[in-house]
Amino acid sequence: MANSPSAKKRAKQAEKRRSHNASLRSMVRTYIKNVVKAIDAKDAEKAQAAYVLAVPVIDRMADKGIIHKNKAARHKSRLNGHVKALKAAA
């Protein structure tokens, strides 16, 4: 446990950041999940719309350091590949 006042403050700040970052990570997962659901449902238009909404959110969270930039790129690339394949099949 933190003993000095500055250590107590840092612990409090770290906990606050941790909970805030957790909610942002959850939001990213939700946007990704919406795209995946549309892809699984074979709905090309809905998948494209969900992908367009998800990309800026993923990028923003990568810029803020909530997720790693390579992880963001990987998600975008894979989702885009699935959406394009779905549109090509339709």
From Swiss-Prot:
Recorded GO MF terms: small ribosomal subunit rRNA binding; structural constituent of ribosome
Cross-referenced Pfam families: Ribosomal_S20p
Domain of life of the organism encoding this protein: Bacteria
One GO CC term, this protein: small ribosomal subunit
InterPro entries: Ribosomal_bS20, Ribosomal_bS20_sf
Keyword DNA damage (UniProt): no
UniProt keyword annotations, A-Z: Ribonucleoprotein, Ribosomal protein, RNA-binding, rRNA-binding
Region (Disordered): 1-25
Protein family: Belongs to the bacterial ribosomal protein bS20 family.
Gene3D superfamilies: Ribosomal protein S20
Name of protein: Small ribosomal subunit protein bS20
The UniProt record lists the keyword Ribonucleoprotein: yes
Biased composition range(s): Basic residues: 7-20
Biological role stated in the UniProt entry: Binds directly to 16S ribosomal RNA.
PANTHER family: 30S RIBOSOMAL PROTEIN S20 (PTHR33398), SMALL RIBOSOMAL SUBUNIT PROTEIN BS20C (PTHR33398:SF1)
NCBIfam families, per the entry: S20
GO biological process: translation
